[in-house]
Design a protein with these regions (language model features):
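C-terminal regulatory or interaction extensions
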Residues: 1-167
Length: 167
């Protein structure tokens, strides 16, 4: 089964159209599902800026990416595992702005999942895909809970975004 991720890099904080069009990169990554995660991971990591900072105390210079890998990779894996594949012609979209990275997955919440209970309710729309991704060690079935515990401020933004999806 193939899946597509469309990566769009926007110059600015909002996408513009017409004479102010500000998309500086637009790339589609089309791969079988098990290769898609690796391909997207490599491509997106290459798009991130890397900052060099001098550590306080040791004086050593260390590099850190614009966005830590864990949250955005979890978002991509989750989107691949749980997107609505019945929505033909749709794709996962990763939009990179100057101040944020957004991951959109086609389809509405499945079955009993809502914006309010998503952090503790488990339901897999694509049981076979989720099982195979677990066997290949891409999924541990606790991604969103781990994300919320690790990134509480970003989780608040995520909840607000998820609530918009249900309207």
């Amino acid at each position: 089964m193939h899946c597509r991720i469309r990566f769009i890099r926007i110059d600015g904080r909002e996408m513009q159209v017409g004479a102010n069009y500000n998309v500086v990169k637009d790339k589609s990554i089309d791969e079988p599902i098990l290769r898609l995660v690796d391909a997207a991971k490599a491509f997106i990591a290459d798009q991130l800026r890397v900052f060099t900072k001098q550590e306080h105390g040791s004086g050593k210079f260390v590099e850190s990416p614009e966005y830590p890998e864990f949250p955005w990779l979890e978002g991509i894996i989750n989107a691949v595992a749980h997107r609505d594949y019945a929505a033909s012609g749709q794709f996962i979209k990763v939009s990179m702005y100057d101040d944020r990275l957004e991951i959109e997955s086609p389809g509405r919440f499945p079955n009993i999942v809502t914006a309010d209970n998503i952090s503790y309710t488990r339901f897999s729309r694509n049981k076979t895909i989720a099982r195979v991704m677990t066997e290949f060690e891409w999924v541990r079935e606790l991604a969103l809970k781990r994300f919320i515990q690790t990134w509480p401020m970003r989780a608040c933004l995520l909840r607000n975004t998820l609530k918009r999806q249900t309207r």
